[in-house]
Amino acid sequence: MLWSYAFWGSLGLTIIVGIFLLISRIDYFSYLKNTVEITISILPTILGFCIGGYALIIGFGQKDVLTRMSQPLGEAENWMSYYQVLSSVFAISIIIQILTLIICVVLSYVCNLNLSSSYADGVNISGILLCIFSSLYSIWLTYYVVKNIFIFGQMMHFCIRKEELDKQSDVIN
């Protein structure tokens, strides 16, 4: 997941934005402040969604379904179970989103200091690119979270239906 389409898409878009920034010669400091403000305004909502989804899967799963999901996916002893894969997708997404939020909050504080430097353009461009990459990556990781919540719901539905069908077949036999 770390080297997924979300990662490469975020990296590609960040490079494209970087090229446009160098060509356009806009006010990098204002652009940095705006980028940080946008990220800080949307990321807590996305982070809350991911934490809520993680809590939903960890806290509200039926024990027999979670037992089935805890079986290793492969034949080797070190293969992860689907439950571990599901949990790791959420954990990585949440960690990256927390790091993105920390980066943007720190950049916000630094922007408010109004420091001047001979390296201001380079520092501002680096901050912009770091903020854009991490925020795009955090947003695109939400796709994997939604996908895993959906798959978890489908597995819960399947296990419940299978249990009902097994009970019906026992009654018939």
What are these regions (language model features)?
Residues 92-115:
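Alpha-helical transmembrane segments and their membrane-interface junctions
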Residues 70-89:
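Short membrane-interface loop/juxtamembrane segments of multi-pass integral membrane proteins
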Residues 2-42, 117-120:
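Long, highly hydrophobic alpha-helical transmembrane signal-anchor segments
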Residues 5-13, 88-100:
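Select subsegments of transmembrane alpha-helices in polytopic membrane proteins
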Residues 53-69:
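Membrane-water interface of transmembrane alpha-helices
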Residues 148-173:
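Cytosolic/matrix-facing juxtamembrane and C-terminal tails of multi-pass cellular membrane proteins
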Residues 36-51, 133-135:
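Alpha-helical transmembrane segments
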Residues 125-151:
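Alpha-helical membrane-embedded segments
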